[in-house]
């Protein structure tokens, strides 16, 4: 099947949102909010391509007066071009958040990138991206920031503190649009050019250029995302993803090249995928050469959790109903799997990861805050990440912070950065960050104003 062929195929009894959006914008006849399809020569494609004018709003099902007309490129699937990319930034949460907000679980820093935005064509059943109701996510269109690499390069030139470039925590970096626009590649090249490490997170094939760039810095690494060992379930959960056999072969190939491989087993959909199946997945990953696994049980905002449940029941029948029976806990405003089930599972899974030579960590996994008697004090959530992690950092690979004094110099690792990163650094060193930099010790949600300040080591 081609990169986009699955969008016209049946993936179950439910109406996959990715397919719904694709079929809406590709319908041949004009209608309200869709002009007729026409052929136009395009310099980026270097040929004539199918385009049409569409009227979109920044919330799903926006009224006509709240829509604007944009040109939509229909190949290889509907997308629009935007001039200004989302700025580079760190994690969305810092160490010292409000007590009403779930605490940040990420041990170390990363620089978030967004080479492509909006809708994602991998079409994962559980994905929060395609279920979004606001912004470009709600339009059902992909967004492509033009000259993304140049925009990233200009921002990096202003930065004096840095971390690994995360490409990307949103849509997949290697989707078919990458072959046309090269935004992920140009972004990665800019990070490498200034001496910063990178990591990619993907459910699609790693291109050769990505593997080559990962070899440029010993702190760079590859991440892939997979949450079942059953090929049929995988097709239903992530219909646009690489096959499991191809994924394992790709892991072998990167492992032989000496690339560190971290796997996000994320999200585990309890009831549909059993712990026994996750252990079998660990066995296949270890045999292929993976180094680290990160587990997370599925969660969803309450506004769309019922839709997810309905979708799972339609796709998986009785197993979907079992999932519904476990998908019962409210923690930090998110609906997730029963706490007792999750904690018992993490204990089991971490044991088997260690048995197989894999390090283990969790991602955004919480439990209720309780007193010594077990009474619940708060349902906001307390991170369980440190309890179950067998690696120094939750992403597995030890990646320090980076700094430089001026734009004409390369970034260099902070020598006394602790293996575990910034989040616990000061708390475990008598309240003082080991590098001596106050801002690093606060582990804030880094914005560009923060990234412009060099790390002042003492």
Q: Where would I find each of the regions flagged by the language model?
A:
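Conserved Radical SAM active-site core
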Residues: 69-223, 231-232, 253, 439-458
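Short coil/turn linker and secondary-structure boundary residues
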Residues: 13, 29-32, 49, 143, ...
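Short secondary-structure boundary segments
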Residues: 34, 38-82, 161-169, 173, ...
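Auxiliary Fe-S-binding modules of radical SAM enzymes
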Residues: 2-64, 68, 279-458
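Conserved AdoMet/S-adenosylmethionine-binding subsite of the radical SAM
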Residues: 147-337
């Amino acid at each position: 099947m081609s990169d986009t062929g699955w969008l016209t195929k049946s993936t179950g009894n439910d109406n996959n949102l990715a397919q719904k959006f694709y079929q809406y914008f590709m319908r041949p006849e004009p209608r309200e909010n869709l002009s007729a399809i026409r052929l136009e020569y395009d310099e980026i494609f270097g040929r004539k391509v199918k385009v049409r004018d569409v009227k979109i709003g920044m919330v799903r099902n926006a009224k006509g007066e709240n829509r604007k007309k944009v040109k939509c490129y229909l190949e290889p699937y509907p997308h629009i071009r935007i001039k200004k990319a989302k700025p580079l930034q760190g994690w969305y949460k810092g160490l010292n958040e409000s007590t009403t907000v779930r605490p940040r679980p990420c041990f170390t820093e990363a620089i978030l990138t967004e080479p492509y935005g909006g809708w994602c064509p991998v079409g994962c059943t559980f994905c929060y991206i395609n279920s979004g109701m606001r912004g470009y996510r709600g339009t059902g269109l992909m967004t492509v920031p033009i000259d993304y690499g140049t925009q990233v390069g200009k921002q990096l030139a202003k930065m004096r503190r840095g971390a690994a470039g995360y490409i990307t925590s949103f849509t997949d970096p290697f989707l078919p649009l990458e072959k046309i626009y090269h935004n992920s590649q140009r972004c990665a090249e800019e990070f490498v050019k200034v001496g910063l490490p990178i990591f990619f997170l993907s459910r699609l094939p790693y291109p050769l250029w990505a593997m080559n760039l990962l070899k440029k810095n010993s702190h760079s690494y590859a991440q892939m995302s997979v949450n079942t060992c059953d090929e049929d379930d995988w097709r239903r959960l992530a219909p646009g993803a690489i096959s499991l056999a191809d994924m394992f072969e790709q892991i072998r190939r990167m492992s032989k090249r000496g690339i560190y491989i971290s796997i996000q087993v994320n999200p585990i959909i309890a009831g549909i995928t059993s712990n026994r199946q996750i252990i079998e997945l660990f066995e296949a990953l270890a045999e292929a050469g993976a180094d680290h696994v990160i587990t997370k049980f599925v969660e969803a905002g309450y506004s769309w959790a019922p839709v997810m449940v309905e979708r799972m029941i339609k796709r998986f029948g009785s197993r979907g109903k079992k999932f519904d029976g476990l998908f019962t806990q409210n923690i930090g405003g998110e609906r997730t799997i029963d706490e007792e089930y999750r904690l018992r599972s993490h204990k089991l899974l971490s044991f088997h990861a260690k048995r197989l030579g894999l390090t283990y960590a969790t991602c955004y996994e919480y439990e209720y805050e309780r007193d010594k008697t077990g009474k619940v004090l708060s349902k906001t959530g307390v991170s369980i990440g440190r309890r179950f992690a067998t690696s120094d950092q939750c992403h597995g690979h030890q990646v320090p912070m980076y700094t430089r004094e001026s734009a004409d110099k390369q970034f260099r690792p902070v020598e006394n950065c602790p293996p575990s990163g910034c989040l616990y650094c000061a708390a475990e060193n008598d309240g003082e960050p080991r590098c001596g930099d106050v801002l690093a010790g606060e582990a804030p949600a880094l914005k560009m104003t923060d990234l412009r300040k060099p790390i002042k080591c003492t």
